[in-house]
From Swiss-Prot:
<dbReference type="GO" id="GO:0005737">
    <property type="term" value="C:cytoplasm"/>
</dbReference>
<dbReference type="GO" id="GO:0006805">
    <property type="term" value="P:xenobiotic metabolic process"/>
</dbReference>
<dbReference type="InterPro" id="IPR050182">
    <property type="entry name" value="Cytochrome_P450_fam2"/>
</dbReference>
<keyword id="KW-0492">Microsome</keyword>
<keyword id="KW-0408">Iron</keyword>
<protein>
    <recommendedName>
        <fullName>Cytochrome P450 18a1</fullName>
        <ecNumber>1.14.-.-</ecNumber>
    </recommendedName>
</protein>
<feature type="binding site" description="axial binding residue">
    <location>
        <position position="466"/>
    </location>
    <ligand>
        <name>heme</name>
    </ligand>
</feature>
<keyword id="KW-0349">Heme</keyword>
<dbReference type="GO" id="GO:0007480">
    <property type="term" value="P:imaginal disc-derived leg morphogenesis"/>
</dbReference>
<keyword id="KW-0472">Membrane</keyword>
<dbReference type="InterPro" id="IPR002401">
    <property type="entry name" value="Cyt_P450_E_grp-I"/>
</dbReference>
<dbReference type="GO" id="GO:0007552">
    <property type="term" value="P:metamorphosis"/>
</dbReference>
<dbReference type="GO" id="GO:0007304">
    <property type="term" value="P:chorion-containing eggshell formation"/>
</dbReference>
<dbReference type="GO" id="GO:0020037">
    <property type="term" value="F:heme binding"/>
</dbReference>
<dbReference type="InterPro" id="IPR017972">
    <property type="entry name" value="Cyt_P450_CS"/>
</dbReference>
<keyword id="KW-0560">Oxidoreductase</keyword>
<keyword id="KW-1133">Transmembrane helix</keyword>
Length: 538
C-alpha cells in the first residue's frame, strides 16, 4: 500500500506541472504500474493457495477459462484431463472448479461427508434450499433417509413383495405404451411423446396416484415446461460462474421464464396436495404425497412441526421434492430409452440378438417380466452399453466441499465446484476396449453372465448417488425388452441415421427422429393391445 500511495502522490505532482499530452502519457504509465503492483500483491498473497491447488489452465481475468470451454463443456474437460491429469482445477468466471476423471478418486471422495455439499450459485438460491437434489445439511440427510425408506415400501427394491408392486405399476404403462405404438400401423412415429407419457405415468402413480393420457392438454403443457426448463437451464448456466451476467437482457428474460414455469408447476402440484389433504386417510397411504402428509400430521401431533424439514415451509418442501423427483426421473429415463433406440437403429445385428434371446427365453405368448432379467444377459448388457455410450448426464451433479479437503497432496477449498467427469470414465480407453464402439458384450463375462465393473457409474456414486436407480433399472428393462419383443424398428425411407452427437443441455438428448415399426406378433392373448390395456389396469 505504501508503494501505491507513493505512486499516486508522484503522479499527482507531475500532473500539476505537465501539459495535457504529457499528463495523459503519465496517467497511462501510472495505471500500468498500479496494475502491475496490484498483480504482484495478489500473487504474493495467493501464492500458497495457488501452489496447493490441482494444476490446470489459468484463463483470463474475470471470466477465467469460460471463453475457451465451447458449447460442450464435458468434451473440453476431457481434453483438459488428458493435458493436466485426472485431477485438475480452473476458474470458470469467479468460481474455482475442480474436475475429477478417475473413477477411484470419484468413489473415494463422494463417499466422504465433506463432499455432500452443493455450490452456492444464483440458480441454487432461487430454490431457497428446498427439495432433495439441491438441498444440503440436515434437511438433505433427513429427506434422503425418509425418501429412501418410503420408496422402498412402494417397491423400489429387487427384494420381497415390493418388487411385484412396482412391476405392476410399470407394466400398466408398458401395456399402454405398446398399445399406442400398435396404432401407428407402420407409419413414421416420433417416439418421444409416447415414451414421455408412459414414463411420466409411472412416476405420477408412485408420487400422487395420477396418470395422463397422451392427448391430455395438461400433460402436454407439463411436458413442455420440463423440456423448456432443461433447455433454459443450459442457456443461463453461465450465470452460476459470472453472477453479474444476471443483468444481461437475454439472461434476465430466461430467468424470468424459468420462474414463471416453476410457478405454474408449483400451482399444479399444490392443487394435487390440496386434493390429497381433503381425502387423506392415515390408515390408507396411497402414494408419496400421503406419506408426506402423514409425516406432517405426526409432527404437529408431537409438537415438533416447527423443526420438521429443518424449519422450512412444509408444503413448499413437498412441492419441490415432487418437482425434483419428477423432473429427474422422467427426463433421464425418457432420454435413455431414446438413445437405446438410436443404438438399435445404428446396430441392427445387436437388435436382432436381443430379439432372438427374448424369443428363446420369454417365448412368443407374453411380455418379459423382472423375473426374466437374470436369464437375459444380452438384453441387459445392451441397456448397460447404451447407458455407458450415451452418458446422458456427463458431468453428473456438481458437489461442493463443506470444508477444505486435502486430496492427493492438493487442497480442495470449501465452496469450490467439484465436478465428476462421468463421460470421461465411461469413455476411458484404459478401462474400456475401443470405447467409441457400441459393444454390449463388454458387460458379459466368460460364463455368460452380466458383469458391471465398478467404473460403470451412470447413477453416480457415494452419499448423493441417484435415489431412483432401482426404479430406473426396472423401467429401462421392462420398457425396452417389451418394445423389442413386440416390434422391429427401422428408419423411414430416405432418412439418415440419427447422429451420436446429441443436443447438450441439462442432459444430452438425441436429435429428433422418427421410426417405422413392424409388429412382431405375440400369441393370441398378448397380441391384442386392448386386452393388454385391460390386463395392465387390473
Amino acid at each position: 500500500m505504501l508503494a501505491d500511495s507513493y505512486l499516486i502522490k508522484f503522479v499527482l505532482r507531475q500532473l500539476q506541472v505537465q501539459q495535457d499530452g504529457d499528463a495523459q502519457h503519465l496517467l497511462m504509465v501510472f495505471l500500468g504500474l498500479l496494475a502491475l503492483v496490484t498483480l504482484l500483491q495478489w500473487l504474493v498473497r495467493n501464492y500458497r493457495e495457488l501452489r496447493k491447488l490441482p494444476p490446470g489452465p489459468w484463463g483470463l481475468p474475470v471470466i477465467g477459462y469460460l471463453l475457451f470451454m465451447g458449447s460442450e463443456k464435458h468434451t473440453r474437460f476431457m481434453e483438459l484431463a488428458k493435458q493436466y491429469g485426472s485431477l485438475f482445477s480452473t476458474r470458470l468466471g469467479s468460481q474455482l472448479t475442480v474436475v475429477m476423471s478417475d473413477y477411484k478418486m470419484i468413489r473415494e471422495c463422494f463417499r466422504r461427508e465433506e463432499f455432500t455439499g452443493r455450490p452456492d450459485t444464483p440458480f441454487m438460491q432461487t430454490l431457497n434450499g428446498y427439495g432433495i437434489i439441491n438441498s444440503t445439511g440436515k434437511l438433505w440427510k433427513d429427506q434422503r433417509r425418509f425418501l429412501h425408506d418410503k420408496l422402498r415400501q412402494f417397491g423400489m427394491t429387487y427384494m420381497g413383495n415390493g418388487k411385484q408392486q412396482m412391476q405392476k405399476r410399470i407394466m400398466t404403462e408398458v401395456h399402454e405404451f405398446i398399445g399406442h405404438l400398435h396404432a401407428s400401423d407402420g407409419q413414421p412415429v416420433d417416439m418421444s411423446p409416447v415414451i414421455s407419457v408412459a414414463v411420466s405415468n409411472v412416476i405420477c402413480s408412485l408420487m400422487m396416484s395420477t396418470r395422463f393420457s397422451i392427448d391430455d392438454p395438461k400433460f402436454r403443457r407439463f411436458n413442455f415446461l420440463i423440456e423448456e426448463g432443461m433447455r433454459l437451464f443450459g442457456e443461463i448456466h453461465t450465470v452460476d460462474y459470472i453472477p453479474t451476467m444476471q443483468c444481461f437482457p437475454s439472461i434476465s428474460t430466461a430467468k424470468n421464464k424459468i420462474a414463471q414455469n416453476r410457478a405454474e408447476m408449483q400451482r399444479f402440484y399444490q392443487d394435487v396436495i390440496d386434493d390429497h389433504k381433503r381425502s387423506f386417510d392415515p390408515n390408507n397411504i396411497r402414494d408419496l404425497v400421503d406419506f408426506y402428509l402423514c409425516e406432517i400430521e405426526k409432527a404437529k401431533a408431537e409438537g415438533t412441526d416447527a423443526e420438521l424439514f429443518d424449519g422450512k415451509n412444509h408444503e413448499e418442501q413437498l412441492v419441490q421434492v415432487i418437482i425434483d423427483l419428477f423432473s429427474a426421473g422422467m427426463e433421464t429415463i425418457k432420454t435413455t430409452l431414446l438413445w437405446i433406440n438410436v443404438f438399435m437403429l445404428r446396430n441392427p445385428k445387436e437388435m436382432r440378438r436381443v430379439q432372438d434371446e427374448l424369443d428363446q427365453v420369454v417365448g412368443r405368448h407374453r411380455l418379459p417380466t423382472i423375473e426374466d432379467l437374470q436369464y437375459l444377459p444380452i438384453t441387459e448388457s445392451t441397456i448397460l452399453e447404451s447407458m455407458r455410450r450415451s452418458s446422458i448426464v456427463p458431468l453428473a451433479t456438481t458437489h461442493s466441499p463443506t470444508r477444505d479437503v486435502e486430496l492427493n497432496g492438493y487442497t480442495i477449498p470449501a465452496g469450490s465446484h467439484v465436478i465428476p467427469l462421468i463421460n470421461s470414465v465411461h469413455m476411458d480407453p484404459n478401462l474400456w476396449e475401443k470405447p467409441e464402439e457400441f459393444r454390449p458384450s463388454r458387460f458379459i463375462d466368460t460364463e455368460g453372465k452380466v458383469r458391471k465393473p465398478e467404473y460403470f457409474i451412470p447413477f453416480g456414486v457415494g452419499r448423493r448417488m441417484c435415489l431412483g436407480d432401482v426404479l430406473a433399472r426396472m423401467e429401462l428393462f421392462l420398457f425396452f425388452a417389451s418394445f423389442m419383443h413386440c416390434f422391429d424398428i427401422a428408419l423411414p425411407e430416405g432418412q439418415p441415421l440419427p447422429s451420436l452427437k446429441g443436443n447438450v443441455g441439462a442432459t444430452i438428448t438425441p436429435e429428433s427422429f422418427k421410426v417405422c415399426l413392424k409388429r412382431r406378433p405375440l400369441g393370441p392373448t398378448a397380441a391384442d393391445p386392448h386386452h393388454m390395456r385391460n390386463v395392465g389396469a387390473n
